[in-house]
Swiss-Prot record:
Function recorded in the entry: Catalyzes the hydroxylation of 2-nonaprenyl-3-methyl-6-methoxy-1,4-benzoquinol during ubiquinone biosynthesis.
Protein name: 3-demethoxyubiquinol 3-hydroxylase
GO molecular function (one): 3-demethoxyubiquinol 3-hydroxylase activity
Catalytic reaction(s) noted: a 5-methoxy-2-methyl-3-(all-trans-polyprenyl)benzene-1,4-diol + AH2 + O2 = a 3-demethylubiquinol + A + H2O
GO CC, one annotated term: plasma membrane
Comment on bound cofactor: Binds 2 iron ions per subunit.
Underlying gene: coq7
Length: 208
């Protein structure tokens, strides 16, 4: 159930996600790999793809926080909080890599965060089965996007590829976690709407 304390925590998390540099406990994947020379076109492509991935992590943070605020089972809420902390590392990795590539984060991050937070709240209100099912499907779709990006990233951009590869592993673990806690399958129409919405986000974030 929502209360003032939870709302304050949620607002604080939003400010940290959108304004503060993200922190990571694990070493950044690929940090010891060489920074191979990229052409201007390759560097721009890598930066755009990493910007999309950063937006995905902003959305994941918002989604997890919204779901955790309305989760009915304490064990589920704690699992969501833990997953959100792990996603913070992805924020740090992609943020750092975007800077290294000379790119910029999406100017629409507040919009992405707000929309995803609202979805998380709604999913949580529907009950933990749907809450976790929505989470599992989200992570599966994110994992698919990351697999696509591994195909599109320049082969010699080994640092970006290392980050995306580890993120893909982590997202698969989060999907498995959601199912293990009781997440149910979503109706096909909902999956289709999620995929359509995700497509709009990725195409927009590629540029802005």
């Amino acid at each position: 159930m929502l209360n003032v304390d939870k709302l304050i925590i949620g607002f604080d998390n939003a400010l940290r996600t959108l304004l503060a540099p993200a922190a990571t406990l694990r070493p950044i994947p690929g940090k010891d790999l060489p920074e191979n020379e990229l052409s201007k076109i390759e560097k721009r492509e890598s930066a755009a793809l990493m910007r999309i991935n950063h937006v995905g992590e902003v959305c994941a943070q918002a989604l997890y926080q919204g779901q955790a605020l309305t989760a009915r089972n304490e064990q589920v809420r704690q699992a969501l909080d833990q997953a959100a902390r792990e996603e913070t590392e992805h924020l740090a990795w992609t943020e750092r890599r975007i800077a290294e590539l000379g790119g910029h984060k999406s100017f629409l991050n507040p919009l992405w965060y707000g929309g995803s937070f609202a979805l998380g709240l709604v999913a949580g209100v529907l009950g933990d089965k749907w809450n976790l099912g929505f989470l599992a499907e989200t992570e599966r779709q994110v994992e698919a996007h990351l697999a696509d990006h591994l195909q599109r990233l320049p082969h010699q951009d080994v640092r970006s590829r290392a980050i995306v590869s580890q993120m893909k592993v982590d997202e698969a673990c989060h999907a498995t976690m959601a199912v293990s806690y009781g997440g149910g399958p979503l109706p096909v129409p909902i999956k289709a709407v999620m995929k359509f919405s995700s497509g709009i986000m990725t195409r927009t974030a590629y540029w802005v």
